[in-house]
């Protein structure tokens, strides 16, 4: 968690679940697309230690945002976002979305953007045809969080609307 995180939007990129070779589970990523805007967060990198963040985000490339981030910081600092390189994407396999990962993402969107933000997250994210592994009883996502009953219900209510398959 970053204490100085704040809401922001990323212009010209869309969000999607991506499969990569050698991983059992998919990753949430972004790809360039003209005319799109997605919600997210910005935060200072603790201790400006980009190497540590790059190590944590090992399957992602750090990309300079070059003014694509809409935010309220003046003067605007240099910013970057992370994307899984397209040359590592695979289109088939037994990959799954970890429900514990999705839960954490939705919990964050709810806290930062409210119910409407959660709706926008589901609506602006692609790849819901990937099966979802219900690992809530024994989370496999390393940064899993405990959700309230209301947060869990919010996640669960969106999945049928997207024809998502929970295993």
Summary of predicted features, one role per range:
Residues 1-167:
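A glycine-rich, hydrophobic/aromatic-adjacent loop/helix-cap motif
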């Amino acid at each position: 968690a970053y204490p100085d995180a704040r809401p922001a939007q990323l212009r010209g990129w869309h969000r999607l679940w991506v499969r990569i070779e050698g991983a059992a589970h998919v990753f949430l990523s972004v790809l360039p697309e003209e005319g799109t805007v997605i919600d997210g967060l910005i935060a200072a990198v603790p201790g400006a230690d980009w190497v540590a963040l790059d190590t944590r985000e090992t399957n992602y490339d750090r990309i300079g945002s070059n003014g694509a981030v809409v935010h309220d910081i003046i003067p605007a600092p240099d910013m970057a976002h992370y994307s899984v390189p397209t040359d590592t994407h695979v289109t088939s396999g037994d990959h799954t979305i970890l429900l514990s990962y999705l839960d954490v993402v939705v919990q964050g969107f709810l806290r930062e953007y409210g119910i409407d933000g959660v709706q926008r997250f589901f609506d602006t994210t692609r790849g819901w045809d990937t099966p979802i592994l219900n690992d809530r009883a024994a989370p496999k996502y390393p940064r899993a969080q405990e959700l309230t009953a209301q947060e869990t219900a919010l996640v669960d209510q969106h999945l049928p609307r997207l024809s998502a398959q929970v295993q």
